[in-house]
């Protein structure tokens, strides 16, 4: 099921993105810039491997990731 813009992301997506964000912070990087770079390019090399963040971000719905990033500005 595709998410329409403006819909609230699922709890599992939010939890996954929170875990990814924590892993990026733990590695000493800015979660916003790494997730934004991934979202804009689709290149997973923007995201650290720490805590399996790189593997996990590939599984997140891009609409959920965009929604999360809009809320963190």
Which role does the model predict for each range below?
Residues 2-73:
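Intrinsically disordered, low-complexity, basic-enriched segments
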């Amino acid at each position: 099921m595709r998410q329409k813009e403006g819909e609230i992301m699922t709890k599992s997506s939010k939890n996954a993105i929170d875990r990814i964000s924590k892993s990026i912070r733990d590695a000493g990087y800015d979660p916003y810039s790494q997730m934004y770079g991934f979202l804009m390019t689709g290149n997973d090399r923007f995201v650290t491997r720490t805590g399996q963040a790189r593997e996990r971000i590939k599984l997140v719905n891009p609409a959920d990731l965009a929604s999360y990033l809009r809320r963190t500005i």
